[in-house]
């Protein structure tokens, strides 16, 4: 008879593990967020730069005005604005102008009292217009003005092109023509008509002359202080002349003068008439400036060398490389970065994670259980992706679609910040346009406060953008997990935390196909589990029946068991000194 001995052999298979993950980096950067404070990320986009000082330049794509009249040699801008005889020329059109004469300058003609009027602003006012031209004819007939007849006074200090006596083209020095009208007079009024083309601003220059008592009597027949008033567009200005007390002064090599002139201007809007009320010594308006358009004005220096994106009062000409800058805040024109108080960086990657580690612990029958933490090294083609662990080692593959979605979100945030930049620039530009007539009197504290407010708005926008970029990682990983689960199907078991245990091997090729979305579980063979192997052992039949065989086996086994028990008992008793054993030969 044959006896059957059953031998069991089970073949097991080590499954691979696939997980979704995020790239790691060996050089983390730090960005600021709204609620998480400083966060380490794998990459950043610097949004700020700190400029260095450079020379001033022309603005790219824009006509930039340095001197009002570049062809008027040896002339200050004030000479040009007043119409000094040897400083008559064309002022080129420009959308940007450099205020290069910071300190009040002399006229280079007759001594002017700068401290009593805003005359030093006249060149700056003209710079604020894109198009400027001097009228071809006079706005008033000075000889027949009220209080006349007058003769137009000239001075050897104001030589004309033939080196004869002259005077400013914008004003007529109204001196009584004969002794009969060299007398004191009550205030007289003259209307100043609008003679420019419709839509242009008319800048009308006027003034008055005063001297010591002797000269006042000689010229005007009255040594008392004279009263003057101008009015245009609801703005009225009053003056009372000063008699005497002036030292002799020569301008630009001219003759010494004991008298002074006070010069002012008024801006007449399209179609509006102005008025001037005066007594003796009036400088009546003659040629007027007709101006239109806006030219942005900034303090700077000449010459203008080359071209730049931006002109900055502190740094000169700049090329814009970043949307914002840190350093000294000052006015700037052109395509300029916006000033912010601190450096800003936009997250351009994922939240930093150290390289992933596989933490292992022993389970039943030595089975290895593990879980992953950190980010994956080697994910060079993207930020999000997959990793597998198994006999092949570690394989990593990036998911390009998920990474592109993350990049698109960052680009959207960057564009939003750019839109915020444009809005703030428009706001600043509007404020500057409203105040361009008073550019030298702008309150720096107000300007700094406005800059601080805008800086805070921008910083908050960057913090919120970084917050959104970092928080969106969970969305991308969840989407990857759903995508992975769908592709693996029944060939894997979801073990949580974005990981799946597969019923097949998944090497680099397998993982690359998962990342590319072309994975097919059927292409990777499932491991086979061998069924129970049963081997039958045949025993020779020597005439012994089964009962006899079993009797022999049981007797031998029982005898062996009893013998072992006795031997163990004797050894135990000897060790306890309860039994002694003597051996004699």
UniProtKB/Swiss-Prot annotation:
Keyword RNA-binding appears in the UniProt entry: no
Residues flagged as site, Cleavage: 362-363
Gene Ontology terms for molecular function: host cell surface receptor binding
Subcellular location: Virion membrane; Host apical cell membrane
Residues listed as glycosylation sites in the UniProt record: 40, 74, 160, 181, 319, 348, 507, 533, 546
Lipid-linked residues (S-palmitoyl cysteine): 581, 584
Disulphides: 19-499, 75-87, 109-158, 506-510
Superkingdom of origin: Viruses
Membrane topology of the entry: Single-pass type I membrane protein
GO BP, sorted A to Z: endocytosis involved in viral entry into host cell; fusion of virus membrane with host endosome membrane; fusion of virus membrane with host plasma membrane; viral budding from plasma membrane; virion attachment to host cell
Transmembrane regions listed in the UniProt entry: 554-574
Post-translational modification: Palmitoylated. In natural infection, inactive HA is matured into HA1 and HA2 outside the cell by one or more trypsin-like, arginine-specific endoprotease secreted by the bronchial epithelial cells. One identified protease that may be involved in this process is secreted in lungs by club cells.
Predominant localisation class: virion
Signal peptide per UniProt: 1-15
Cytoplasmic side: 575-585
A GO CC term attached to the entry: virion membrane
InterPro entries associated with the record: Capsid_hemagglutn, Hemagglutn_HA1_a/b_dom_sf, Hemagglutn_influenz_A/B, Hemagglutn_influenz_B
Keywords carried by this UniProt record: Disulfide bond, Fusion of virus membrane with host endosomal membrane, Fusion of virus membrane with host membrane, Glycoprotein, Hemagglutinin, Host cell membrane, Host membrane, Host-virus interaction, Lipoprotein, Membrane, Palmitate, Signal, Transmembrane, Transmembrane helix, Viral attachment to host cell, Viral envelope protein, Viral penetration into host cytoplasm, Virion, Virus endocytosis by host, Virus entry into host cell
Extracellular side: 16-553
Entry function: Binds to sialic acid-containing receptors on the cell surface, bringing about the attachment of the virus particle to the cell. Plays a major role in the determination of host range restriction and virulence. Class I viral fusion protein. Responsible for penetration of the virus into the cell cytoplasm by mediating the fusion of the membrane of the endocytosed virus particle with the endosomal membrane. Low pH in endosomes induce an irreversible conformational change in HA2, releasing the fusion hydrophobic peptide. Several trimers are required to form a competent fusion pore.
Miscellaneous notes: Major glycoprotein, comprises over 80% of the envelope proteins present in virus particle.
Subunit structure as annotated in this protein's UniProt entry: Homotrimer of disulfide-linked HA1-HA2.
Record family assignment: Belongs to the influenza viruses hemagglutinin family.
Protein's name in the database: Hemagglutinin
Native organism: Influenza B virus (strain B/Beijing/1/1987)
Lineage, opening ranks: Viruses, Riboviria, Orthornavirae, Negarnaviricota, Polyploviricotina
